[in-house]
Amino acid sequence: SVGFKAGVKDYKLTYYTPDYETKDTDILAAFRMSPQPGVPAEEAGAAVAAESSTGTWTTVWTDGLTSLDRYKGRCYQIEPVAGEENQYIAYVAYPLDLFEEGSVTNMFTSIVGNVFGFKALRALRLEDLRIPPAYVKTFQGPPHGIQVERDKLNKYGRPLLGCTIKPKLGLSAKNYGRAVYECLRGGLDFTKDDENVNSQPFMRWRDRFLFCAEAIYKAQAETGEIKGHYLNATAGTCEEMMKRAVFARELGVPIVMHDYLTGGFTANTSLAHYCRDNGLLLHIHRAMHAVIDRQKNHGIHFRVLAKALRMSGGDHIHSGTVVGKLEGERDITLGFVDLLRDDFIEKDRSRGIFFTQDWVSLPGVLPVASGGIHVWHMPALTEIFGDDSVLQFGGGTLGHPWGNAPGAVANRVALEACVQARNEGRDLASEGNAIIREASKWSPELAAACEVWKEIKFEFPAMDTL
């Protein structure tokens, strides 16, 4: 008889393998799945494994031409989610050979491709990925990483300070450059193009690059510190994006910027390679992330997007504030902040980390805290994020009653006061307000900032809970 038997058979017969021992080279995924009523968890988990690897809805003749055992994804464990009805965490192991080397794009096309539209599931969310060292090693990763960046900037022992230039749309290039200069002159390390500033009719990219470069050099000369402005190279085509990055390099500026989700992983990886070859730092903005990661039971958790960015390449990435106006629950945020910075991260379910991740020697990424933060948040930010971070105050700099430069001074004084207090062994969590008040006695700029923002809070419950 012929070995081929046509017809539809249950996924779980082939793809649910509870006895499977995961290999060190497997990519492991944790999915939060909500099956349709009446679909057993094992069948749903097996369906996820099948549809994101070798399976299709019916047996096909060509299955006989390959070795399914070698190439199939396997659902090897299923656990119910506490407190949720009919929701499970399904663990899936993928053989390494299913993925193209050095391609985040291909990895995502497989793991989070068609399977998310699968009818037997009401919802599906990718909670975490374990990237094996064998696969990590096929990626260049961040152009420079944390240590090289500090050496380039000659700034040690404290978080870096930034500011997004507002209003985000509508300024002319010359006025934009002026705002950049004032912020850098006041004491910030970086200023930033807003993520939606690309090359619009009111300010074409080349004009902006030129005026910002002038601002950087003038501020450097006057302060004796290295300064940078994240020049947004994001564009409608990869070629245009590269053209902008090349122009930035010709101006001799230290850093460019990219919106990695709207620009796409392929473009981002190309830009990251260019940045390493040409000594440019790369700042990454995560515009569009909340579309993908904010729903609790469908989509992709940001920790996965953060891991993907570390593989694709970026030296800074926005990662929530814990205290400002945007999403972020403390333990979970710190979980993916560590995934960005550290070489080795232990599995820790209380922080949402489903797998131990070994990055081997892939450089780290600086997390950027940005969004609704001001001087009163400085002690908490210094405490939560530590030295290896970038703290960005947009409105918290430009909204200062006396102008941009005094706003920058206020932030820098607050930061230096917090770092000094921490180094003296004081507890920033309990003494934070006192530390800021004390510092404001000898800094009128800080005193004015303290007055303006003394009552501002963004108190809503976080959605990103376990």
Swiss-Prot record:
Species this protein is from? Tropaeolum majus (Common nasturtium)
| Pfam families (UniProt xref) | RuBisCO_large, RuBisCO_large_N
**Reported modifications of this chain:** The disulfide bond which can form in the large chain dimeric partners within the hexadecamer appears to be associated with oxidative stress and protein turnover.
List keywords of the entry alphabetically: Calvin cycle, Carbon dioxide fixation, Chloroplast, Disulfide bond, Lyase, Magnesium, Metal-binding, Methylation, Monooxygenase, Oxidoreductase, Photorespiration, Photosynthesis, Plastid
Q: Which residues carry this modification: N6-carboxylysine?
A: K192
Q: Which domain of life is it from?
A: Eukaryota
> How does this chain assemble?
Heterohexadecamer of 8 large chains and 8 small chains; disulfide-linked. The disulfide link is formed within the large subunit homodimers.
EC class, as a word, reads lyase
Instruction: Name the chain's protein.
Output: Ribulose bisphosphate carboxylase large chain
Q: What is its EC number?
A: 4.1.1.39
This entry's Gene Ontology molecular function terms read:
magnesium ion binding; monooxygenase activity; ribulose-bisphosphate carboxylase activity
